[in-house]
Amino acid sequence: MSKAYFIGAGPGDPELLTVKGRRLLDSADVVIYAGSLVNPEILKGINAEVYNSASMTLDEITGIILKSVESGKKVARLHTGDTSFYSAISEQIEKLRELNIEYEVIPGVSSAMAGAAILGQELTIPEISQTVIFTRLEGKTPVPETEKLSKLAKHKATMVIFLSAGMIEKVKGELLQGYSENTPVVIIEKATWKEQKVVRGQLKDIVNLVKDSGIKKTALIYVGESLRASSESLGKESKLYHKDFKHGYRK
């Protein structure tokens, strides 16, 4: 029996697929990709049976994997971004374990990280925010009570919100339970794609920003005071490179 590989395809730009991910994709006999999210440019030139999972059920996906590995074929299951965020690989892995199918997970570049690179900044700024919260607004998939957006907002940490641009009015209301209305926000649609959009503003204006730009989905919402670093000097320095800071490599 062969093996299945869950591969993070990165945010969209084909050059942001990892070297290992590219190698496994190119050598796969069967590729199952998230067609509504993965950039089709990534699939160009591959010599494999290709299945678009956009309209498939969990059982249909695992059925293809089972049939393929039993035939000795290498399977690449291609997900957008990094597999650790909202990829639904957990339920697929449970099925593979039940079927005694060997698998391996290959990480990818998350759109959240790509977005920070687009902004040209880090998300943790000394004395301003040393915590980043990755989350989503409750939708069809419920979230635990302690992870409601309104409760997370009270930390005032840097926040990256997935899968929520289509419910922007509710997002604003929840965020205002913790952040001030003047808190910087950035919305990035289709990060690193040719169609990429970047919109900046303040929390009080976030609804109009999203609606006026025509952003509806496949967008990330960044919130927090750390976002000022992409447009102004904050004068906050870490101790790491301070001349008086001593460590094992600099005494």
List each model region and its residues:
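Class I SAM-dependent methyltransferase SAM-binding "motif I" and its flanking Rossmann-like core
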Residues: 2, 13, 82-85, 89-155, ...
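Active-site catalytic pocket residues across diverse enzymes, especially alpha/beta-hydrolases
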Residues: 46, 119, 123, 175, ...
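A contiguous loop/helix-start segment that scaffolds small-molecule binding in enzyme catalytic cores
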Residues: 2-4, 60, 71-75, 131, ...
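Class I S-adenosyl-L-methionine
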Residues: 1-109, 114, 219
